[in-house]
Design a protein with these regions (language model features):
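Regulatory inter-domain linker segments that are low-complexity and enriched
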Residues: 1-3, 88-117
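Forkhead-associated
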Residues: 3-8, 12-87
Length: 117
């Protein structure tokens, strides 16, 4: 499940799981991700999620939205991208579907074809 890790000056403030098709980000208290700082607009940006695609859209904010240090209006997000709003950094993390490396598979005799002559 995609998630956002919000930090300032290297200190993590919060972690938010993205569970909705539309997640709002801004200074106002009704946003899904609230960043209470004057450098962040009341309705700063929105994160759209559809299937396996996630994108961020700037909502005409005063100070802009940056992805990997580049000003964007609308941008697809990739695992590890850094979003900047004001002095805040938001790390976007998205685990690949179906990768359950922590699970052990047990094969019984006859389940795997024999190799060799």
């Amino acid at each position: 499940m995609p998630r956002m890790i919000v930090s300032i000056d290297g200190v993590v403030i919060k972690e938010v799981q993205l569970t909705k098709e539309r997640t709002t980000l801004g200074r106002r208290p009704y946003n899904d991700i609230v960043i209470d700082n004057l450098a962040v607009s009341g309705e700063h940006a929105v994160i759209h999620m559809a299937e396996h695609e996630v994108e961020i859209e700037d909502l005409g904010s005063t100070n802009g939205t940056y992805v990997n240090a580049k000003a964007v209006k609308r941008q697809d997000l990739r695992n590890g991208d850094t979003i900047e709003v004001g002095k805040y950094q938001i790390r976007f993390l998205q685990e690949a579907e179906g990768q359950n490396f922590d699970k052990t598979m047990i094969f019984e005799p006859g389940m795997v074809p024999a190799v060799g002559p």
